[in-house]
Structures are given as C-alpha cells and as structure tokens.
C-alpha cells in the first residue's frame, strides 16, 4: 500500500508517458501577445527627469565683512583660535592686503566650480554698496540665478529682527542690513550662502519675510486700492536657496587646526578640507605617518582623473551624488543636483560640510532642508578610498613609485552587478546607479558599466525612469560620438530601452546628429539581426511624427537601408523595417517619391504574405501611409495609389483581425485622397441597394420590432468584454436624435420615413453621421451587408486587378466586407469610413441622377482631392432636393436593426417605435437586462462649425505603439512560463496532472466494458434550442450553442456557469464548436453558417467576462441557408491547423499560428460538405458530403492530385464521417439512412457495413470506446457498439414522470469518458453515462 502511495503521483508521468509528454509539447493556439493584450501603446512617461527650467548661476556677489584685526563685540574668541580665511592667515600681512587677498582667493575657489560666472567682490561694504552690487547683478542676470555669499566673521552676529551687519564708510559703526531689503535687491532666483555664527537666524528671517511678501501680494490682488496694487510686483522668493553654516543658536567652531571659514572651505575646497579632517581623525587612518604637510603634496590636478588628486575628486563627486540620490526625494534631487551646475556642486559639498561640522557640534542648515546624510554608509567607502590613496603617499613622494588607482569604481560596479543578479522583485533601487553614470565616460570602466546599465534598463519602464532621473541621458547621448565598435550593441540596446519609454528624446538625437550613429549600425551587415532590429525601432521613433527627424534620416539614406533588409530572416527586423518606412514617408512627400524611385511599394508587397501577422500588419501600415500623403498628385502617383490599393485589397480575407484593422486604416487614407470618387461610388451603391431583398425582422403595423420568443423565460445574457465588444444597439432616443439632426423632408413637404436599408442606427461604430460623438449612422449594418452580399465576394476576387478605372468600386466592396467583419473592432472602424463617405455623398448630393455603372467605370481616373474628408453634420436642414438621388427616402417606416441583435433570443417587446435593445453587456452581471440603457453623451448642438474631419483622428490603430512595447519590457528575463517556480508554470503542471488522471480513470471505466449508457447524470433546460454541444476534454464543463448564444453548464454540479451572445448576425446560426488548447488554457471556437469563425476566452469564469480573442471569415462564399450543412470544422491541436468547409466546394485549411489560409482543397463535388475529420500523422482529411460520398484527401499532394479516394456507397446525406486517430485507423461514416460503413483508406471499398436506425438528425462516434450514438426525429437516442448491436435506447427523461424527450437536435460524446450529451428541440440538454457502479 505504501509503495502504491509513493508511486501514485508519478502515474500521470509513467503509465501514460506518451499522452502526458504530448500535453507539454502541444503548441498553444491564439496565446501570443497579440491575442492576450489590447493592441495599444503604453501610457507615456511623465517627463519628471527632463528639467524644464534648467538654470545657470551667471552672477556671484562675494560680500566679506572681515574688518581684519578687529574682533566683533559679541564674539569671544579662544586662544589659540581658528584664523585662516580662504586658506589665508589674515594676520600674515597688512589688513587691507589681507582683505583683498582673501577676496581674490574666494573668487578663485568659486571659479573652480563655475568659471563662466560674473564675479563681483564687496569687501567690508556699506549698505549702499551692497544695494548697488545686488541690483546691478540682478539687472544683468535677468531671469537667471544670482549667488550672494556673505562672510560675517568681522561683524556682530545676525539679529532676531532679521538683520545682518555691514559697516559705515568710516568703519566706526556696524550698520544693520535688513534681510527684507536684501531679498528685494537680489530678486529671484537666487542662492544665498551665510558663513557666520547664528547663521540659522538669517534663514528663519528670510522665510518670514518671504511669507510676508506673499500675504501682501494676496491682499493687493484682492483690493485694487491697496498701495501695493499700484506698484510693480515684488519678486517671489519661492525659487531662492539658502545655505547657512550653523543653526540659529550655534557658534562657528574655533579649533586652531581648522580654518575660520570652515563652512566656506567645505563648499568651495572640499577635497582639501576633507583630507585635513580625515588626518585629524586619528582612529581611522591605516597609515599613521601621513601628516598635514604631506597632504599638501598629493600630486595631480583636481580635474585630471588619472592623477591621485583628480581621482579622489571624482570619487567624492560620485559618492556625494549617490548619497543625495538615495536620500533626497526625486523632485528635490532634480532641483538641487541637476538643474544648475554651481548649485549642484555647492550641495554636494554641503553634504561634506554637514559631516565635518557636525563632528564639532555645529549643524549646517539649508533651505530647502535636506534629510540628514552625515551617517550614510557611502561615507565609509569615501574613508576607505582616502585611506588607500594616502597610504601610497610616502612611497610616491619619496621613492617615485607609480600610483595605483583606487578599486572604488570597480567595487561599486560589482555591488551593482550583485544587486542585478541576486535581488528580488519589489526591491529598493540599487544605491550604485549614480556611480554607474559617473563611470560611463571612463574608458577603463565604460564597457562594463554600459553592460550593467543595459541589464538594469531591461528590468522595465520603471528602471528606465530611474536611470533618466539620475541623469543618464546626456552621458549616453555623448557616447554616440564614439566610434568604438564594441560599444555599438550596448548603446543600441540602451537607446532602444530609453526611446521605448520616452520617445520625446527623438529631438535631442537629431540635434546632436545621433541618428547618423544608428543609420550606420542599421546598414552594418555584420551587426546581429537583434541589434539591427533595435536600431530600426530607434530610427522609427526618430522619424515618428517629427519632420526634422524625417528629413535628417531621408538625407541619411534610411529608405534604401531599410529596403535592403525587408526580406531578412528575422521577423522582428522585417516588422520594424516596414514600420520605419511607413513612418518616414508619413505626410512627407519627398520621402514618398524617394520610395517610388526605389520601388519601395513593390518591395513591400512580398511582406503582405509574410507568415508572421505582425509583419503583414507592418507592411499594411507602411503601404497605407504611402498612399496617405495629401500633396498634389499626378497621373503617375494616382496609378501607384491604385496599384497599392489593389494589392492591399487581397488582405480582406486575412486571418488576423489586427491585419484587417490596419487594412481599414490604410484604405481610409485612400478614401481621404480620392473623396469625390468614393462619394460617387457610395451614391451608386446606396441606390442599387434598394433593389436587393434581405430577410428583415417581422414588424407590427406600428413599426416596432417583434422579437421571436424562444422560451417562456428571459435568461440574462452575460456581460461580454472583449477587444471587440459585442456592442449595444442604439436606443430609440438616439434614433430620434438622428432624425432631428437630418431634418430631411421630401419635396412634397412630408416627413421622410426610414428603413433599415436606408438611414438607421448601428451599434457597430461610434460616430454620428460622420461625427465621433454619437452612435448614429447613415448606413446600418443591414444596409452594408445587403450591399456586400449583392456584390458577392467571389466577384470581388475576380475583379482585383482587372480594370484601372474600377479601383474605387472594388475598394468600396472591400470596405463593405470589412464593415461586416466578425471582429467588432474591425467592423467598427470600417463603418466609420463608410458612413463618413455616405454622409458626405447623401447630404451634399445635388439633384442629379447617379452615374450608372458604365459611366463610372469608363470615366478617366479623377485627380484626388487636395484635402482630407471633412465630415460636417447638417447645420439645420439640408435642401429638400438634396436627397432626391439617394436612398434616404422610403415609404415604409421600420425600426433599425442591429447586426448583433439575436433574433432568436428571448426578449420583450416595447411600445410602438421602441427598439429591442439588450444593454446587458455594458453593465455588471448583477444589472437587470432590460433596465434603462446607457446615457447618451452626444452633443446636441446643430452648429456645423463644431463638426470636423475625423477619419484621420478616429480611424487608426495602436499597432505601432503596441509593437514598441516589446522594447520597454524585459527581454533578458526568463519567460514566466519557462520559470519552474512561477505561478503560471505550477498551474500548467497541475492541469497536466489533472489531464493524466482524467485519461487514466476514463480508460479504466471503458476497459471494464460498456453494457448500457442510459444513466442520466445531468438534465437542465437550456436558454435556447441546443444546436451544437461540446464536452470540455478535462473539466466537467459542457458548451451548448443555440442559434446565436453559448451556454456553459457544469454537468457534475448541475449548475449553469455562463451564457453569452456569440455576436453573429441575426440571420445566421452557430453550426460548429471546438475547444482549442483543451489540455491547457482552453479557448472556444465557434463557427457560423455565414462562414465566420470566432474564438472566445474567459468563458465559464466567474471572475472575468468572456472575451473575443480573435475572429475571421473562415469561408468567404457561404450564403446562410436553413437546409444547408452550415459550416463544419475539424481542429488539429498538434499542428495548429483548422479544417473548414460546409456549403462550399472547397476544404479550406487555416494555420492558426500564422493566421493565414494555407490551402484550398477542391472537393470535386457539387454538394456541400457535412462532416470533416483529419489525422495529422497521416496528413489525411476525410470529408462526408451531402450527396452521400466520402472523399479522402492527402494534403501533402498537389491540389490536382490530392483527392486520393472517393467512396460512393452511401446514397444519402452523410451525417458523420470520422477518421480514427491511429496509424491504421479506419474511416467510420454514417448517412441519414442509418447505414454505417467502415472503410480502410487503402482499400477502394468498405470493409464492413452495419445498419442502425433510420431518420437520423444527429450522430457521434466515441473516439476511445467504439460507441455510436444517434439521435432521431422520432424523439429517441440509440447507442450502438462497433458491431452494430443496440446497447440501449433513451426515450424518456428521468424524474419527469416519464416525460418523452424531444426531437434530437444535437449530441456529442465526451473525448475520454463514456459520457453522452444530448440536446433536443424542447430546450433540454442531458448527459448520460454508464451505470454508477461501473464509474
């Protein structure tokens, strides 16, 4: 028993090795990013890193009140005492000379940090001299910053009244100088440095006076009679910065080994004072022999990093920058450390001042106030760097040995690398990021730093934002001037990451000629494709909606470089090269003609059939912008436009909705260019549409829609959220609004009546008569669909490329097909384009006859209009005659019908004139279905000036921006599905173990033998008549389709899990369903008899709403009929191929990975295909047909030879033809006459014939258990074994007092369990199994 328990978890991986490994190896369909994400760009980054108000300190006032030789009365100095001022002993020379020398030295010290500023000294000044100095500097500085340095060592301490001291002319008195006056003279922006005792008092007084000014300004603004109201506004003090040597109650330190102006020394000569202070801390030195005299002999220059002194200065800068970035709030760091070079230097040095002066019980003060930094751990790294440097001094000076560079930067990069390697999610940013920035321009560390920076940026947009905020941008911009080839991949990667997050850097790149760097990289054939892809992306950003960038890259030969790489094997490179081309000639005619000369459009044609949907989409985008220029055109350009349009038209049947949506946008550019031609075509189609009949909803005499009631109950349709939402029908109120807006009257003066074929609302788009604010249309879905079906799809295919003059007609047909697209986002956009032209054509039509077909197609190609389509809503009533040539007049009043309105849905009827309006999908599931609809938000204004062109604004996709998101996301990180510890991976393992258990347990039941299959384990009333039923292979979920909705049931618990509308038009029905990815993340595919295929996810999920993953027109020539086979499909999970057929003469094979049609196999018969079955291992397809024939196709062979066998033994409609999925598997087929025939595909005749009940309506064959179940019109289900022996009949429901089952409408076996689901015309769905004791 113990051994069994130990082995039981392994059973799923041991006994059924092949099946379980298959689960892991099976490809997943429709699970790529384009299916799982909304096709839109990322939210743009708020540019907090870019300094909008970068400043310079242009003027410096150096005010020294020293009065050398005379001590102020309120200061008692120690003996000995600190005497040095600017490293000068004032008593070593005469007082006046000392004062001048100190002033000159202070200026030199400041000039080290800002050599270009204008310096003015004021030595022992009077109040008037200070005023004159300050007002002069402010006047010259204008809006730039001015620095005021005040040394008050020779005057009394500041007063609590807000005064500092200066002198009278004769130096006989100390004269107070009000900080209020100083504020007035200095203005803003300014920075003040106070080096005196009690300096914190000045900071407090400054703030009080600043607040007082603000209050005075507020009073003056309220009261115009206030004296201040008549005066010029005093400057605001908000942009003023203050640095003070100590708190309000503190005195400056007087230790004789320190300079008297310790604060000034820290701010202006930080390395010198830091080294002296370090030597005074006896406990920290590694080498006791280093003296203050030795420090003065450190070789090198501060600005030369290769020397000991320069390296120390570099390390100091990196450490103080790092401390500030890690401690300060981001906005304060930006303001103090990145806005102004001199301010940044002073604040870096202020951090040192805080560290040194606090050790002498003195606390420097700043405004804005900084958090304490003197205990930060990075100071220990500084101490170590100083110690390592000083330890070498004796040997360097005495023996002349070479200086060994500090390991500081290498060690900090290692720490950064450890953070990248060993860190966890949701961590604090790495402390070393500012140090990485410091070493980018160092040749020694550059390569490693760039590599680590790239790895950091790859963590995501947050990392890019951090790097930009620390100031990385100017460094990586400067590096583009480097010619080192080894830097190319790293710089390309870093710039791709930056531009993916903040595309505004395009201007900086072009300004600094950075685009030339990337042009040379893209043109480099030795550069790996991945890096050329990133380069193509970078260049695509540079030229995106930026004319200067377009011109610069055009001159750099970008078009030719891109064209050379259109057929590169790397799909992402093909995609971005195409996007790059599309962007460079977007609204830039010079680039377009350069493309014409290089035959760019013809070279792009090959990408329209690319196996990767994103590449096809990029090619469509590029060709769309190619024809979308609004410059003057010639006959030559018109011919090119027509050729491009006809090539694009072939993509109308592309399997990817992303491609088709981009196609609509591309064609809309053509519509804009040739507006008048399309208006003419639109009028003709509208006129012709009246001649075609279309099944229309029943109407009462009052004109209200009468929905058919399928059921006595009104089930609640579940909310459907999708990238293409199933949209609500517009309400009667919005319809009335559209009638009022048009105010159309016939010439007789009577009101115009509307029909669904003429003016109607539609849920398929969101523009009101060409205005995007409302949901009303000239053309309803039904009108468009009638036009589309009247000009049949096959005729479209035959027309492509036939006549130069019929291009507009053909493109209009293409747009009609796209407006009826099964994917709502595609149809929405196409409806906008069609309605914009229809509105313009009908409202602006003159009272003249519409051109007939011959005159239209024979006319010469008209020149395009010079401007885009400008759709204006009717301002008041148009002329009465304006509708005489359109179909906007009709005698029969009908309510408009939505394309998504389920005709067979249970519903209610409203009062006459009201519209049947399911709003349920727009609200949470708890909302009542027929509650008040969504509020209309349309603007009712009739002012025509308020309506504007909208095609270019609203008819667009987010494809390019969505594609750019790839570069913003981590590319080095292991995908979550491959990470053994990720939640996704663990969920997959659990699902595969569950699958193994289901297969094993089901097989055990089947092996026991099946003697009866009539134990009813589930019975429930479905909301609609079941038409297709499908078991999920591994969960207790069953999908039941009625005409146009899907219901999901848990057959174990007997609960309804979900119910939602499939979205197919009301005259169509669901005829087939398949579970995709059933072994993992299941999707449901539905096929309708108009040839449309839809794929859903999140069904039967209580936490999420169903979403449409994709949809496409699987078969194009099908016309829905009540007696046809509809659409039949068969799904191959192993290959990702979908076989489709039905009321057509072909079997069409779709590759769901490529989202392309890969093969059309002609059936060779005149009847419909009723059943499909395939075997991926043998590449065989078996089709059962309506004429009774069974046809076998080998899809590896040429189309003319691929039909390898035809069996004509059945004489009636084939209900089911099944190809057994094993190497020697037979074909089992059944006709409505009940004859079961078994064929060996290698033999020309059947190998066995069985006879079962006649009059079959539904049939299924169990893939594992050799069971055949058939449903009859005579209200019973019969189950047979493979020998044709009847196992049992099912005629009555359990628990209903023997109620008879209805006529069987559908049935299906479970793929593994011996379970049978049966749907009948009385709405009931039931599941039967073997006896309980066997289960």
From Swiss-Prot:
Biased composition (Polar residues): 851-866
A Gene Ontology term for the protein's cellular component: neuronal cell body
Keyword field contains Iron-sulfur: no
Composition bias type Low complexity, residue spans: 874-887
WD-type repeats, residues: 1020-1061, 1065-1106, 1121-1160, 1164-1203, 1209-1249, 1251-1291, 1299-1335
Chain residue numbers at which the record places covalent cross-link Glycyl lysine isopeptide (Lys-Gly) (interchain with G-Cter in ubiquitin): 932, 948
Mutagenesis or variant effect for residue 792 to A: Abolishes AMPK-mediated phosphorylation. Increased O-GlcNAcylation. Does not affect phosphorylation after forskolin treatment
Glycosylation site list: 700
Effect of residue 700 to A: Abolished O-GlcNAcylation in response to glucose sufficiency, leading to decreased mTORC1 activation
Outcome reported for the amino acid change (mutating residue 932 to R): Decreased ubiquitination
Protein's cellular compartments: Lysosome membrane; Cytoplasm; Cytoplasmic granule
Family stated for the protein in its record: Belongs to the WD repeat RAPTOR family.
Name of the protein described by the UniProt record: Regulatory-associated protein of mTOR
Protein species of origin: Homo sapiens
Higher taxonomy: Eukaryota, Metazoa, Chordata, Craniata, Vertebrata
Gene: RPTOR
